[in-house]
Swiss-Prot record:
Pathway: Protein modification; lipoprotein biosynthesis (signal peptide cleavage). Coiled coil: none annotated. It is found in: Cell inner membrane. It comes from Geobacter metallireducens (strain ATCC 53774 / DSM 7210 / GS-15). InterPro entries: Peptidase_A8. It comes from the Bacteria. The chain crosses the membrane at residues 66-86, 92-112, 132-152. This is Lipoprotein signal peptidase. It holds the Pfam family Peptidase_A8. Its EC number is 3.4.23.36. Keywords: Aspartyl protease, Cell inner membrane, Cell membrane, Hydrolase, Membrane, Protease, Transmembrane, Transmembrane helix.
Amino acid sequence: MKPNYRIFSIVTAVSLVIDQATKILVDRTLELYQSIPVVPGLFSITYMRNKGAAFSFLSNFDYRRPFFIAVTLVAMAAIAITFRKLRDDQRLAAVSLSLIFSGAVGNLIDRVRLGEVIDFLDVYWKTHHWPAFNVADSAICVGVALLALDMIRDERRQSKDN
């Protein structure tokens, strides 16, 4: 197995297992909207359901479920195509795309199974709350940040070589 495919398999599997296990744990142990402070004034575990996308975007759109499923499948295909084009030395890009892919799959599982996504990570400062999110959302954000860093690093390396 090529190194990047090994990375993809491991990162995707680990991220997906953590995402689904935490969602199952929250769903089985908390009531909807129940909140458990972890770091008072900063972070709680709060069981929420999100019918939309980030920040509940399109949560009232009638065809949101098939729309989000279709968009996710297209994104997953684009990630897979991009991944296949990576060189063996592009390990950070491989990790990045794996995280983004696993996050997409994690939220897709929720949408197909429940028609909505389980969110539970609640970050806030006093009365100002960031929208609740989950491990899949975190994987996507970290993956995008790492991919941006990898692109900057590659650009600097190429300009240095020229």
